[in-house]
A protein has these predicted regions:
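A short acidic, glycine-rich active-site loop
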Residues: 42-46, 116-124, 189-190
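Glycine/aspartate-rich loop-and-adjacent alpha/beta segment that forms the canonical ThDP
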Residues: 112, 146-190
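Active-site diphosphate/adenylate-binding microenvironment
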Residues: 1-54, 59
Length: 190
């Protein structure tokens, strides 16, 4: 949650924030503050992995004076990274913050909590998204420690180009689901 505290301090109040599906973005919903509506765009209950980046591009086109920040995990951004070419070609200057934990975080947390840490298909290998962004002609920033996020966000917004901030997140820091939140889905077998 330290990441979101830092973002609260550095994001301009006119920011529009787009969220993806997944546990890191669920945390962001509660941890960030939103001003100047419409300022929060999320697929919350629909599980649209990869939604945030494309949504951010659309919000920026509709509201060009707003600072637009898209928050996503590495899995979701990996699905939609090719849209960077659209952002660069048309000058759609958003900032995408990729919380890179080298896993499908929601699935991994679910497997940890409900399947005794028996992980299947939860870990992924993601590229250095900051470097990939630069290959597309966007700006790329790497954040290895939370203390570096403010400077990276300021530089990304100031760059006036599509920007990607690749943030290293501890893959063991999983956001657990409440065990009772799925109780209604249990089937009783006799």
């Amino acid at each position: 949650k330290g990441l979101f505290k830092q973002l609260r301090r550095v994001l301009p109040k006119n920011s529009a924030i787009t969220l993806d599906a997944g546990t890191l973005c669920l945390q962001a919903t509660d941890a960030l503050e939103y001003y100047d509506p419409p300022s929060l765009f999320t697929p919350l209950d629909f599980g649209l992995v990869g939604f945030s980046f494309a949504c951010g591009l659309g919000v920026k086109v509709a509201k060009p004076k707003k600072t637009v920040v898209s928050l996503m995990g590495d899995g979701g951004f990996g699905m939609t990274i090719s849209e960077l070419s659209t952002a660069v070609e048309y000058g759609i200057n958003t900032t995408t913050i990729v919380m890179n934990n080298q896993s499908w975080g929601a699935e991994k947390a679910y497997q940890k909590d409900f399947f005794g840490k028996r992980y299947l298909g939860a870990d992924i290998t993601s590229p250095s998204f900051d470097k990939v962004a630069e290959l597309y002609g966007a700006r790329g920033f790497k954040v290895k420690k939370i203390s570096e996020i403010n400077e990276a966000v300021r530089a990304a917004i100031k760059s006036n180009k599509p920007s990607v901030i690749d943030v290293d997140v501890d893959p063991k820091a999983l956001y657990s689901f409440r065990r009772d939140s799925f109780k209604h889905r249990e089937k009783k077998w006799s």
